[in-house]
């Protein structure tokens, strides 16, 4: 399937972005949407060229593990990901206060395996010239390998990956060192108002749900982590029943199937991780975290939909993405940037985004401002959002962001790494091909009513949880229209 891509438009975007960056401390000229947009008219005259979407091949290993393989012959490179549907949200299923165990397990997976201690393992990676990493999110723990596809190199790289999966070292002295380093890092984070705001926001938003805690855990819980905790997490969750495998690069399908089967054979069997419960909606409130800073860091938002998995969900996601780009996308033509930064000078940047997760995501707007202006900045932000919801975004705003999204989407297919990342996301969440190859059509077919309806359905200002971190607690009793609980 092919879609149209304008190279000139990409050049224009790069030029505009570069100019904006170079002049970020100067007044940026906002587009007047009450007048015709010459740049949009000129684009109609630009000759467009074709690009080809990659073909995602789906199969399962002999043991039933889902695989997405994308054959790309341009580079002698192979990317492989093994992702497990069990991240830090499952920490408490190992031990009630074992918060951070998924993150630490991922950390230790690259610190020795089989007969290789940490130093030998790192030397083997360096000798092969490969990237072999592991990391955890709230929903998943993932391992990624990038290697040349030369037979000897790829064979040895796969052998190292299989040792990670089947014979992780989990050395006690290494664990103590990594705990010490993480605790030092967490102590530094305690001085970061953005970190404090994110932690307080997630705790208030998700309450007693497993999503309420940060993936790293906290200082006290990290101190308690033991090798037994790490092994228990690995044995319970890093199993074939929780796994998906994604392979991208210069291989035949037969080679990809062979590799997937080798990886699958390295995984123990067990009981598939249960689906997490849905979180309970939190009451709108203002939470202030005292912090010695002249700036106040602010997050405001609420629960939002989980990962989109159906065509109807994809439409809603696209429509809201367009609306949010116009309202809170972070560019100088986004309404919040224009009003809160350019006109009022409250902040250097303000940005809103949807964070989708397996059972419930969240929408949040983040910025910082001078402590004395915090109340006014929050009040002005709320006013801009209320106006967008009441009156909608304008047709010329939609045209601008629709063109932006149309010409940005092919960047998802611009490199092996970006294609692999997209395929990995699709594999983790069980998304059909239409998720990727239908986006341009969804953008082009989006009407102004569609986009404004998605905006109204997604952003609910009366449900906002507002977190402020700074010296002085702003009085927000008159900001929200509903009863506001101050803490």
Q: Which sequence ranges carry the predicted segments?
A:
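His/Glu-rich zincin catalytic helix
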Residues: 23-123, 144, 231-339, 465-487
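M16 family metallopeptidases and their MPP-like homologs
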Residues: 70, 75-107, 118-165, 183, ...
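Short proline/glycine- and acidic-rich turn/helix-capping motifs at secondary-structure junctions
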Residues: 179-180, 275-285, 396-406
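Short, glycine-/polar-rich solvent-exposed loops and beta-turns at beta-strand/coil boundaries
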Residues: 135-139, 175, 280
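Short, polar/flexible loop-turn hinges at active-site or ligand-entry regions and domain interfaces
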Residues: 112-115, 165-173
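Gram-negative bacterial Sec-dependent N-terminal signal peptides
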Residues: 1-21
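A common structural junction motif
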Residues: 161-170, 263-271, 383-393, 482-487
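Histidine-acidic residue clusters that define the catalytic metal-binding segment
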Residues: 33-35, 39-57, 203-243, 273-277, ...
């Amino acid at each position: 399937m092919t879609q149209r891509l304008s190279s000139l438009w990409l050049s224009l975007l790069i030029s505009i972005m570069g100019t904006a960056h170079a002049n970020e401390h100067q007044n940026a000229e906002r587009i007047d949407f009450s007048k015709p947009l010459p740049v949009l008219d000129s684009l109609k005259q630009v000759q467009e060229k074709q690009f080809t979407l990659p073909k995602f091949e789906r199969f399962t290993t002999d043991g039933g593990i889902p695989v997405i393989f994308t054959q790309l012959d341009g580079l002698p490179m192979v990317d492989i990901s093994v992702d497990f549907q069990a991240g830090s949200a499952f920490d408490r299923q190992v031990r009630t206060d074992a918060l951070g165990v998924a993150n630490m397990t991922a950390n230790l997976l690259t610190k020795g395996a089989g007969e290789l201690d940490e130093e030998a393992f790192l030397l083997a990676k360096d000798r092969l010239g490969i990237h072999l990493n592991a990391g955890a999110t709230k929903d998943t723990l993932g391992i990624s390998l990038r290697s040349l596809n030369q037979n000897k190199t790829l064979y040895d790289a796969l052998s190292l990956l299989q040792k990670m999966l089947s014979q992780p070292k989990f050395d006690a002295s290494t664990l103590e060192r990594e705990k010490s380093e993480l605790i030092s890092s967490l102590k530094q984070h305690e001085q970061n108002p953005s970190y404090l705001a994110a932690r307080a926001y997630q705790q208030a938003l998700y309450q007693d749900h497993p999503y309420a805690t940060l993936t790293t855990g906290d200082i006290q819980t990290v101190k308690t982590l033991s090798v037994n905790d790490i092994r228990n997490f690995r044995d319970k969750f890093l199993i074939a029943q929780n796994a998906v495998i994604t392979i991208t690069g210069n291989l035949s399908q037969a080679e990809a199937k062979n590799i997937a089967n080798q990886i699958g054979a390295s995984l123990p069997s067990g009981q598939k991780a249960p689906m997490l419960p849905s979180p309970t909606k939190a009451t709108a409130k203002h939470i202030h975290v005292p912090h010695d800073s002249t700036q106040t860091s602010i997050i405001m938002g609420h629960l939002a939909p989980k990962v989109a998995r159906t065509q109807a969900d994809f439409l809603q996601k696209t429509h809201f993405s367009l609306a949010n780009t116009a309202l809170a996308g972070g560019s100088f033509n986004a309404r919040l940037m224009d009003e809160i930064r350019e006109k009022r000078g409250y902040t250097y940047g303000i940005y809103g985004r949807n964070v989708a997760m397996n059972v419930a995501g969240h929408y949040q707007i983040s910025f910082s401002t001078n402590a004395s202006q915090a109340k006014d900045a929050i009040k002005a932000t709320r006013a801009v959002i209320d106006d967008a919801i009441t009156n909608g975004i304008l047709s010329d705003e939609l045209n601008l962001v629709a063109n932006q999204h149309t010409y940005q989407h092919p960047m998802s297919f611009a490199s092996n790494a970006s294609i692999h990342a997209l395929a990995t996301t699709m594999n983790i969440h069980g998304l059909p091909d239409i998720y990727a190859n239908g986006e341009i059509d969804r953008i082009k077919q989006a009407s102004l009513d569609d986009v404004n309806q998605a905006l109204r359905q997604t952003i609910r200002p009366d449900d906002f949880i507002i977190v402020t971190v700074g010296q002085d607690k702003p009085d927000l009793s008159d900001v929200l229209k509903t009863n506001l609980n101050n803490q």
